[in-house]
Amino acid sequence: MKLSTTINFFTYEDDGSYSAYYYDLEHYAKLGFSHLDSIFCSADAPFSPLWTNHYEDWAHKIRKKADELGITFVQTHVPFYNFCDLKKGVNENTEEIVRRSIVCTNILGAHWTVSHPGTA
């Protein structure tokens, strides 16, 4: 069994600025965690790197830092919404962020991603 904990890369300050995920990775490594579950559920927030054309570079930087610290990503959680709600329908922007989250999952080296469709 691999003991792991969860890291949310998309934590924002009250002013909308983005928290430094490097510090979180270092913090978990110092606590002795070498396996992480990554949360992408807030990846559609306004300042998310997933809204940029450089989101893959961002994921590669995280992977590099994690590798330096001996951390592996076990799984991720992609953003979700209730696409079954006939009043809301499919949200193309959220669908793109889900797709980008899956691309980042691959870059991070996680073999699984979790989604909760229809439960939001």
Language-model segments: which ranges?
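Active-site-proximal loop/short-helix segments
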Residues: H116-A120
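N-terminal pre-domain/capping segments
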Residues: M1-H111
